[in-house]
């Protein structure tokens, strides 16, 4: 099914997965300069990752809807990635597979959709305006196209401010998983007005 045939997918309001663990603590100590060599080295290490995957809890909260789910994100190559949203029983509510020039999404009824742009597809199908193209960088702790950002005292991204398609996204990082090398985000919150997107990563596998 192509883009003009999109129907709204209503993910289950999975109240049992409220992200209490995703409350973002304040950062300790002064932030570091974006011009520091430590920050440049950290960015280089992250960008050199060929494959990675993470799973955890997802929440989308707005005046119109509240969605809670589990997520699985896997990148297998340049611009090739897979995103799953599942309910508490482990059933897939949404599966997205993207590669250059082609995006496929399967809903919880097995209906398949295709399009060129994953971000547009997610927005039209779910009603959630997730900045997926930028989130692919932000979830790694990289600023992407944003030039307004701050670092924490460990030379890692702590905040991003980015204007996109009339929206002013603010991204705040609540911590990093130091068990991985390089350290990867452990939880983060995106906000634009009354809209909030929360992600809590259980673990990372990087290569």
From Swiss-Prot:
<protein>
    <recommendedName>
        <fullName>Outer-membrane lipoprotein LolB</fullName>
    </recommendedName>
</protein>
<keyword id="KW-0564">Palmitate</keyword>
<dbReference type="InterPro" id="IPR004565">
    <property type="entry name" value="OM_lipoprot_LolB"/>
</dbReference>
<keyword id="KW-0998">Cell outer membrane</keyword>
<feature type="lipid moiety-binding region" description="S-diacylglycerol cysteine">
    <location>
        <position position="22"/>
    </location>
</feature>
<comment type="function">
    <text>Plays a critical role in the incorporation of lipoproteins in the outer membrane after they are released by the LolA protein.</text>
</comment>
<dbReference type="GO" id="GO:0015031">
    <property type="term" value="P:protein transport"/>
</dbReference>
<dbReference type="Pfam" id="PF03550">
    <property type="entry name" value="LolB"/>
</dbReference>
<feature type="lipid moiety-binding region" description="N-palmitoyl cysteine">
    <location>
        <position position="22"/>
    </location>
</feature>
<dbReference type="GO" id="GO:0009279">
    <property type="term" value="C:cell outer membrane"/>
</dbReference>
<keyword id="KW-0813">Transport</keyword>
<keyword id="KW-0732">Signal</keyword>
<keyword id="KW-0472">Membrane</keyword>
<keyword id="KW-0143">Chaperone</keyword>
<dbReference type="InterPro" id="IPR029046">
    <property type="entry name" value="LolA/LolB/LppX"/>
</dbReference>
<keyword id="KW-0653">Protein transport</keyword>
<dbReference type="GO" id="GO:0044874">
    <property type="term" value="P:lipoprotein localization to outer membrane"/>
</dbReference>
<keyword id="KW-0449">Lipoprotein</keyword>
<feature type="signal peptide">
    <location>
        <begin position="1"/>
        <end position="21"/>
    </location>
</feature>
<comment type="similarity">
    <text>Belongs to the LolB family.</text>
</comment>
<comment type="subunit">
    <text>Monomer.</text>
</comment>
